Curated annotation (Swiss-Prot):
One of its GO terms (biological process) is negative regulation of cell division. The keyword Cell division applies. Is rapidly cleaved and degraded by the Lon protease once DNA damage is repaired. This is Cell division inhibitor SulA.
Length: 168
């Protein structure tokens, strides 16, 4: 049983790394994605995002974290394999300021990735503005959205929404 779980975990990590490599090496014009996650399972989100963030850390650009209240710990950044000298954080922002800051940061081209926490769904106009900003700055933006744990018998709601012209 343990061996089976270990193989699945290794396969998931390998797939996440391959996906991260492909995304980081692709010539993208910008990307906005929403990551819905369960706060009770942070390791799952880390398995998906960390390989990509590590790859983006190889670029000369910054990584910007717009966090609601929590501060990133230096120990976590280092243990996650992220470049401490390229990670910037701004915390305790209200949602509208967070959205506007994310748009401005993406547009500059100074950041390889901008990560922000928002609880409400985006309007079509907000999503359009973010997408245009990401394309202009050739950057990736991740909107982190915590979801409530599902009730027993409910379908899990956590997931990754990747908005791309290739699929739409």
């Amino acid at each position: 049983m343990y061996f089976s779980h270990q193989n699945r975990a290794h396969g998931s990590r390998r797939l996440a790394k391959e996906t991260a490599d492909a995304l980081a090496q692709a010539e993208t014009r910008g990307l906005i994605s929403e990551v819905m996650y369960n706060e009770d399972q942070p390791r799952m989100t880390q398995m998906v995002l960390l390989p990509l963030l590590q790859q983006l850390g190889l670029q000369s650009r910054w990584q910007l974290w717009l966090t609601p209240q929590q501060r990133l710990s230096r120990e976590w950044v280092e243990s996650a394999g992220l470049p401490l000298t390229k990670v910037m954080q701004v915390s305790q922002m209200n949602p509208q300021v967070t959205l506007d800051s994310m748009i401005r940061a993406l547009e500059t081209g100074n950041y390889s990735v901008v990560i922000a926490w928002l609880h409400d769904d985006l309007t079509d106009d907000e999503h359009r503005r973010l997408t245009e900003a990401a394309e202009k700055g050739n950057a990736m933006g991740f909107l982190m959205r915590p979801v409530q744990p599902s009730l027993p018998g409910d379908r899990p709601r956590s997931g990754l929404r990747i908005h791309s012209r290739m699929v739409h």
